[in-house]
Amino acid sequence: MKKRIQVHIPYRMLIERLEDVLSAGLNPEIYTDAATLDSIRPKDLKDTREILAEKGLRITLHGPYMDLSPGASDEKIRLITVERYRQTFEAAQLLLPETIVLHAGYDERRFDGDVPLWLSQSRKTWPRFIKEAEKMGSVIAVENVFEENPLPIKRLVESMNSPNFRVCFDTGHLNLFSKVKMEEWFNELGSKVSEVHLHDNRGKWDEHLIIGDGNIDFP
């Protein structure tokens, strides 16, 4: 079971606490924000991968999300997102993660309920990265954040129709933003889910609490 569990950690923290990660045998889900992508050296990424591989640790990668929108109606914003994802995949080619987590990006309020608009823009963004994931043997997992129900993500994943494009289900985000229960998410997306983010909150803030310290009713 431990081999299938990842621990989310920003890249800079991973480097600072690398000995602790290695001694504890933790499989890292490495978070790379925009500042990290702009400053990191390819050699450092390769060295990190090799050190973790020597200990038999598997890597997953979480790409940037602040200010980004892969389905943005503003084409310039979408293209900025594409550029950040391009950098993410450059890092991925050196880290060779099993999964690359990126936010799906649908928000009922920002898109005024226009799922078709978001979907049409999203379909421009993902195909090139799906091809890169296929070459690396990695899976892109799009994560729920502000989505109120699973249908926008389901439509996106089905439209891409690739085994390398799946879903990352986040329990904390569901507790904050979803209008339907967890069971409905898994009824709609269960076969498409390749990763689950397990954390808790009290229903007001994305606190990332230990399971049991919030109010999520885990099955």
Residue ranges and their predicted role:
Residues 71-166:
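Active-site acidic/histidine proton-transfer and metal-coordination neighborhood
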Residues 42-47, 77-86, 115-126, 179-188, ...:
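Charged helix-capping and loop-helix junction motifs
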Residues 8-12, 31-35, 64-66, 105-107, ...:
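Active-site beta-loop-alpha junctions enriched in small/polar residues
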Residues 67-72, 108-113, 175-177, 204-209:
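A short acidic, helix-capping loop that chelates divalent metal ions and anchors anionic groups
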Residues 48-66, 121-135, 218-219:
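Alpha-helix-loop-beta-strand connector modules within alpha/beta enzyme cores
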Residues 127-215:
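Acidic/histidine-rich catalytic cores of soluble enzymes
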Residues 3-9, 28-30, 59-63, 100-102, ...:
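Hydrophobic faces of well-ordered beta-strands that scaffold small-molecule active sites
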Residues 1-87, 93, 151:
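N-terminal pre-domain/capping segments
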